[in-house]
């Protein structure tokens, strides 16, 4: 028979994997490698109460399902002073922490697995122990599923944050592209202004040239009128000269001398008539006084010389034709210049219209660019706030992961609970067959009432509520401080998701609290039953009464575990604490 060592698991680091050992041999240093000094103090004197890890959320499972120890829960930040006790079958090889314990124990009990014989001392389908174990397993499996769903939701939130960051980068690229387009438009506007200035200068030059051409055409028209008047004055004199020619041919001899005398007189008379004719006609322009002298010199040649009488009109007609052709060319040039000026004026008007439209577009674009700048600044602020919230969420998830890991390592040490409960069931079935079951019920109650009362006082609803308030104060403050509504819809959706994750984390925390208290109570009851069964000093009648009392306690604990909900709330904490309160049928009277 291997000796039984009672140990206390003080911290989460001291909880290690401890399964069913068929040989029942395991040293104390293997169970608790990190706390040898605490084991020594445990063996020497009264143990000091220290903080242990608490769990929450137990729901019974069907009796036909297999019992697996899938202990994977979220660790609670609040701790109680109830020690989490662990039992394992081991031989008395440890001389430091187990000698005193083994000496105190007068009886020995083999904690190996169930016997290989098919005939068991109890019913394998017993409703009490099987449903308790199945309920514990079901609660642990559900807690594991809830933690897995929380991790999946956290991954989805991270993916959404990454998509928002990609959208913000695309928006920044679009704003940079718009800024480049604005710079190109500014350069194009400057070029258009330069072109308009050049067109304006060319239009002014064209107007100056047109005015000069108009002045030249007016001068030419005045000269043409002057020449026409001279021709009109010259026509009657030419007719008189033609009539006088036959008379001069008939009397050449008689009038030679008078003709020679008349030539200078005629020249003098023409010279005297020339200025008179010029004074009678329209005066020429002041800038060309030499033009009327040309017909003034031609008329006396035709007047005084007979053979050259027809040269004067012929030369004047050629000059008139040249003048007319020059005037026509001038008119065509003026008309072409006018048409060109009209075209340039139309181009200038079109350019001005385009400039007006472009100015409106530039104003609109500047307004859009300013709005885009404001939106970019707002987006940058929202992105910064979103990054802060994402960092906080990542920190919270990391803390949750660390808590889950530590909780998993702690729950892996609860493996010995299964053989303890099985052994307790066997002993209970064997002990119920005794004859004196109800003789010393009150005396057995008096032996354990003080401890039950202490357990009930430690696991009261008020203490659990205080622990929960203390643990959740920081989280509630963070939620209240960050309860501001974000600006953009995406940030609002992300904020809602973060709040939902926080609520779920709070619910998981409360469920873990209730489950931890329930598991602690179950382990305490199992340890108490183990100690009672190992005591040889107790009489058989007292053993039977004590076992009956423990049976009643286990039934009440099973009822509380069956009624324990898995939804995280304050009422659940109260239910978990009420489940942990032992019944005060026989132990409350001596305590009072």
Curated annotation (Swiss-Prot):
Predominant location category: cytoplasm
Chain intervals with Basic and acidic residues compositional bias: 234-264
A family per Pfam = TSKS
What does the UniProt record tell us about how this protein is modified after translation?
Answer: Phosphorylated on serine residue(s) by STK22A/TSSK1 and STK22B/TSSK2.
Q: Which residues cross the membrane?
A: none
Report where it is expressed, by tissue. Highly expressed in testis. Expressed at low levels in prostate, female breast, placenta, ovary and thymus.
The protein's location, in the record's own words, is: Cytoplasm, Cytoskeleton, Microtubule organizing center, Centrosome, Centriole
Q: Where is the composition biased (Polar residues)?
A: 269-281
Which positions bear Phosphoserine? Answer: 217, 288, 316
Region named Disordered: 232-308, 566-592
Keyword terms of this UniProt record: Cytoplasm, Cytoskeleton, Phosphoprotein
Q: What is this protein called?
A: Testis-specific serine kinase substrate
The source organism is Homo sapiens (Human)
Gene that encodes the chain: TSKS
